[in-house]
Regions:
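Catalytic grooves of carbohydrate-active enzymes
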Residues: 1-47
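Short C-terminal domain-edge/linker segments immediately following a structured domain
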Residues: 43-48, 99-103
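A residue-identity detector for tryptophan
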Residues: 40, 50-51, 89
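A structural signal for short secondary-structure junctions
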Residues: 4-8, 34, 51-52, 62-66, ...
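C-terminal beta-sandwich/jelly-roll accessory domains of carbohydrate-active enzymes
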Residues: 56-126
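Proline/serine/threonine-rich low-complexity linkers at boundaries of modular beta-sandwich domains
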Residues: 47-56
């Protein structure tokens, strides 16, 4: 289940109560090394911060002839946000500081609360 959820960025929560510790510790000792290969581990505070940021982000994409302008608006400064894109789309101009591109995605490591990126679109996508 955790692998299937990871494929689309889902959340896998393990909640353990301390009433029967031996079996639960054994479970954690077995599952954590397997999950670490592809999962992020965080505290409840980190998860809450992530959820608050996720809930406050909106993305708008507008097509103008041979380009697409992607605008990201956020209630909080944007940190650690990945946008999955068509692998043929390429940024038209240099990206702002804190933003990186690889085919199929734009990663926003750190930005303010609004960011626009102009992408070249192949003719077949228009």
């Amino acid at each position: 289940l955790a692998k299937r959820l990871a494929e689309y960025g889902g959340c896998y929560v393990v909640l353990i109560h301390p009433n029967v510790t031996k079996e639960k510790i054994e479970f954690l000792n077995a599952v954590v090394p397997e999950l670490k290969r592809f999962a992020w581990f965080g505290t409840l505070q980190q998860f809450g911060d992530w959820w608050t940021m996720r809930d406050g982000v909106s993305v708008d994409a507008r097509i103008f002839e041979d380009e697409m302008v992607i605008t990201v608006d956020s209630e909080l400064p944007i940190q650690g946000l990945r946008l999955d894109l068509d692998t043929d789309w390429i940024p038209q101009s240099p990206l702002p500081d804190g933003v990186s591109f690889s085919p199929g995605s734009v990663y926003i490591a750190a930005a303010g609360t609004e960011l626009s990126i102009t992408m070249n679109m192949p003719e077949m996508d228009r």
